[in-house]
Amino acid sequence: MKARVTVTLKAGVLDPQGKAIEGALKSLGVDGIASVRQGKVFDIELDGDKTKAEAALKAAADKLLANTVIENYRVEVLG
Amino acid sequence: MKSAVLVFPGINRERDMARALRLVSGREPAMVWHAETSLPEGTDLVVAPGGFSYGDYLRCGAIAARAPVMDAVRAFASDGGLVLGVCNGFQILCESGLLPGILMRNARLKFICHDVHLRVERSDTPFTRGYNAGQVIRVPVAHGEGNYAADEDTIRRLEGEGRVLYRYCSASGEVGDTHNINGAAQSIAGIVNERGNVLGMMPHPENHVEDIMGCTDGRGLFAGLVAHLERAA
């Protein structure tokens, strides 16, 4: 089974990388960009049933993939 | 002082740290591999050195913080043992929950590698007793992610409880945005835990301990630890 964990910075946390990318896009003339926040995507393959997979992914995100001081995460089982 | 230096894959400042500890304490530190599950008998001080553990993949220090040896370090710290984390070591201590907050990308995005001035905020702790309160010292920094951040309550507590021990400043000791090299909250360069036995700091005192290094301002930190342990013994 394939799954995806998306880790993003919480609202209000300064994201210097996102800001730099935002500036670069503006200087490249890409119009209409209001703001950019950078995050991370983990594509994960798992065995077992969907309920177990969701629990494992949540544990993975809580234990290592995200630092919940500054980051939020979202878990999706893609089937 | 019987010290132990943690060694993680990718770390590259462990020998600088060992050299400084040997020089100031007169004893050879133990080098402890990340896969160990215990610390050497009679360890007085555990040091998480700088370097780039696991290549800084994921988040700086995140993988090292989950290494087997860190359970032993947590137990050592909760028994009151002294723990020092420098640079990547500071990041590891934050990621492992031994210190609050996190080190984020430098606000101006650049990797910073030069000497900085630090104001020693108080001298009545094991990590600062080699200095006077308000003293300005010069030590090098070398980091891309040293921008200390925590929620407002944590920052308020750190300040209120006098847990900021080192702060970026000018040569004459002024603190402000122009001297805050990485954008850290409150110009924080080093903090201790609630109990005062775990210090994390971004600058490298171990690289200013001998005349040949051009400055010996970092020596006071290690000398203070030795003095503290001698008095406790």
Curated annotation (Swiss-Prot), chain B:
It comes from the Bacteria. One of its GO terms (molecular function) is ATP binding. Part of the FGAM synthase complex composed of 1 PurL, 1 PurQ and 2 PurS subunits. The lineage of its organism: Bacteria, Pseudomonadati, Pseudomonadota, Alphaproteobacteria, Hyphomicrobiales. It is found in: Cytoplasm. One of its GO terms (cellular component) is cytoplasm. CDD domains: GATase1_FGAR_AT (cd01740). SMART domains: GATase_5. InterPro entries: Class_I_gatase-like, PRibForGlyAmidine_synth_PurQ. Pathway: Purine metabolism; IMP biosynthesis via de novo pathway; 5-amino-1-(5-phospho-D-ribosyl)imidazole from N(2)-formyl-N(1)-(5-phospho-D-ribosyl)glycinamide: step 1/2. It comes from Nitrobacter winogradskyi (strain ATCC 25391 / DSM 10237 / CIP 104748 / NCIMB 11846 / Nb-255). SUPFAM superfamilies: Class I glutamine amidotransferase-like. Transmembrane segments: none annotated. Keywords: ATP-binding, Cytoplasm, Glutamine amidotransferase, Hydrolase, Ligase, Nucleotide-binding, Purine biosynthesis. Pfam families: GATase_5. Its EC number is 6.3.5.3, 3.5.1.2. Gene3D superfamilies: 3.40.50.880. It catalyses: N(2)-formyl-N(1)-(5-phospho-beta-D-ribosyl)glycinamide + L-glutamine + ATP + H2O = 2-formamido-N(1)-(5-O-phospho-beta-D-ribosyl)acetamidine + L-glutamate + ADP + phosphate + H(+); L-glutamine + H2O = L-glutamate + NH4(+). The active site is at 87 (nucleophile), 204, 206. Part of the phosphoribosylformylglycinamidine synthase complex involved in the purines biosynthetic pathway. Catalyzes the ATP-dependent conversion of formylglycinamide ribonucleotide (FGAR) and glutamine to yield formylglycinamidine ribonucleotide (FGAM) and glutamate. The FGAM synthase complex is composed of three subunits. PurQ produces an ammonia molecule by converting glutamine to glutamate. PurL transfers the ammonia molecule to FGAR to form FGAM in an ATP-dependent manner. One of its GO terms (biological process) is 'de novo' IMP biosynthetic process. Residues 3-233 form the Glutamine amidotransferase type-1 domain. This is Phosphoribosylformylglycinamidine synthase subunit PurQ.
